[in-house]
Amino acid sequence: MDIRPERMLSRIRQMAEGAVSPQLVLGLGVVLILGLVVSAMLPDRFTGGGKTGGGVTAQSQALSLPAALPGLSPFTPATPLQFSGRVTQVASIGNDVGWGQVHIWIDNGTGALQEISVAPQAYLTQIGCPSFDGARVSGVGFIFDPGRPNAELYVKSIQVGGRTCKLRDDEGLALWMVVQ
């Protein structure tokens, strides 16, 4: 028996030459692919969805479960708060760690100073916000940690020297962090 590959291929060609045409092979391939596509597109209610016995499951059996998101807590929006007073102190906090933020303390007439987190000095300069030293300011901000005593207020917008400086959006997100 001759088992050389070229000899075996020639015998196979001779046997299939009259029985199978290239058009028939191509046609069968197309029909097979179309059948697979149609089968994949059928809804589960016709195909049983992989369940034995088929049929439709009762909707009342479905339970709504909260998604497990470790480390996340439910979000409650902070209420915007009005503030006004005279600036008694200005400081840039966090410059040593790379996120310098201007903080001001205002005397709002209650006898206690209120700490207010404003914005990075570079952003204040970029938007043309005037100096806070000794100025009378007013504006709107958010306290994101109301349970903490003396929690600072984060400025949404502040008016100083007759100019309004917009620093955060309605959700409290910093405008200087927005990608332009």
Swiss-Prot record:
It is found in: Magnetosome membrane. The keyword Transmembrane helix applies. GO terms for cellular component: magnetosome membrane. It comes from the Bacteria. Disruption phenotype: Cells have a weak magnetic response and make magnetosome membranes. Magnetite crystals are amorphous, smaller than wild-type and irregularly spaced. Deletion of genes mamH to mamV (amb0961 to amb0978) gives cells with no magnetosomes and no magnetic response. Residues 1-21 are cytoplasmic. Disulfide bonds: none annotated. Residues 43-180 are lumenal. The chain crosses the membrane at residues 22-42. It is a single-pass membrane protein. Keywords: Biomineralization, Magnetosome, Membrane, Transmembrane, Transmembrane helix. Induction: Part of the probable 18 gene mamAB operon. This bacteria makes up to 20 cubo-octahedral magnetosomes of about 45 nm in diameter which contain membrane-bound crystals of magnetite (Fe(3)O(4)). Expression of just the minimal mamAB gene cluster (amb0961 to amb0978), including this gene, is sufficient to form a minimal magnetosome chain with small magnetite particles. Belongs to the magnetosome MamS family. May play a role in magnetite crystal growth and size. This is Magnetosome protein MamS. The gene is mamS.
